[in-house]
Amino acid sequence: MMFRVTSVGCFLLVILSLNLVVLTNACLSEGSPCSMSGSCCHKSCCRSTCTFPCLIPGKRAKLREFFRQR
């Protein structure tokens, strides 16, 4: 009887430790706020949000945005 209680306890301990490993290795999905690229799933943190890929607008896009606001 004591052997069964010990083995069940060990089994539950292993399951608990595996759940903790999954939680600590979880990455942030696209659109989530981030502070560094390593925390995002696609390893791309742009302007404090996870995006894939990291697109930086060029002069043409900024000019279109300027005229759109007028």
UniProtKB/Swiss-Prot annotation:
Ranges annotated as spanning the membrane: none
The answer on whether this UniProt entry bears the keyword Disulfide bond reads yes
- Cellular location(s): Secreted
Task: Identify the stretch annotated as signal peptide in this record.
Answer: 1-26
Q: Which organism is it from?
A: Conus episcopatus (Bishop's cone)
Q: What is this protein called?
A: Conotoxin Ep11.12
Query: What PROSITE patterns does the entry give?
Result: I_CONOTOXIN (PS60019)
Q: Name one GO cellular component term.
A: extracellular region
Propeptide-annotated positions?
61-70
Keyword Disulfide bond in the entry? The reply is yes
Q: Name one GO molecular function term.
A: toxin activity
